[in-house]
């Protein structure tokens, strides 16, 4: 989900969905439904659309939910919403996924620099490799939470994930704790130093 337009009065949440039909014999007609809830579990908007997916094929669909008076995500107030996506055959749910999102507006201005929800923000951060001493790359979530809290208490508001793919748990913590993330996958991007290296995953991760 993304929020290209977001103010304290109203926000547009755009949701991109790809649905796969693994049946090899016939097309499948389904309904895609998205429901957005605030942090108290109150529904703030929904959208649904019918579509037909070819046998052994996939279909992409984009939906929009308009939220009035949204609680915007910021460094000081990292408000989050829960987005529930359902794939339905008739009234029966055949698949679903839950996504946590923040509603915010990001802008880069040639004179003012980085703007978050219309306010100028100076990024004060660190490079952070995905490792933690004796535990290596298998970093427990509580350890990440402790380290991020120490950084935030020291005035840090941003993290660059230097040369490593961050875990979803790490990114979720940053969302929850109000920390900006410069999500660098790895220093090779599409141009690998070796034939079989990180760069082979670049397209998949960027998507």
State where each predicted segment sits.
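Secreted/periplasmic carbohydrate-active enzymes, especially glycoside hydrolases
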Residues: 1-181, 206-207
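Active-site-adjacent "subsite" loops/lids of carbohydrate-active enzymes
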Residues: 124, 186-207
């Amino acid at each position: 989900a993304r929020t290209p337009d977001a103010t304290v009065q109203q926000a547009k949440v755009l949701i991109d969905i790809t649905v796969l039909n693994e049946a090899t014999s016939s097309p499948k007609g389904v309904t895609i439904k998205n429901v957005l809830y605030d942090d108290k579990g109150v529904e703030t908007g929904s959208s649904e659309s019918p579509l037909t997916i070819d046998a052994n094929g996939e279909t992409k669909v984009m939906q929009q939910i308009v939220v009035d008076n949204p609680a915007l995500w910021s460094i000081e107030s990292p408000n989050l919403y829960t987005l529930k996506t359902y794939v339905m055959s008739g009234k029966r749910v055949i698949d679903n996924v839950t996504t946590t999102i923040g509603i915010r507006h990001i802008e880069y201005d040639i004179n003012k620099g980085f703007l978050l929800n219309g306010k100028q923000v100076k990024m004060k951060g660190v490079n952070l490799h995905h490792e933690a001493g004796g535990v290596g790359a298998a970093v427990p979530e509580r350890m990440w939470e402790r380290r991020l809290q120490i950084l935030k208490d020291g005035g840090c508001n941003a993290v660059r994930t230097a040369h490593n793919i961050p875990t979803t748990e790490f990114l979720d913590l940053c969302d929850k704790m109000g920390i900006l993330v410069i999500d660098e996958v790895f220093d090779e991007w599409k141009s690998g130093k070796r034939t079989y290296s990180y760069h082979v995953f670049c397209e998949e991760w960027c998507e």
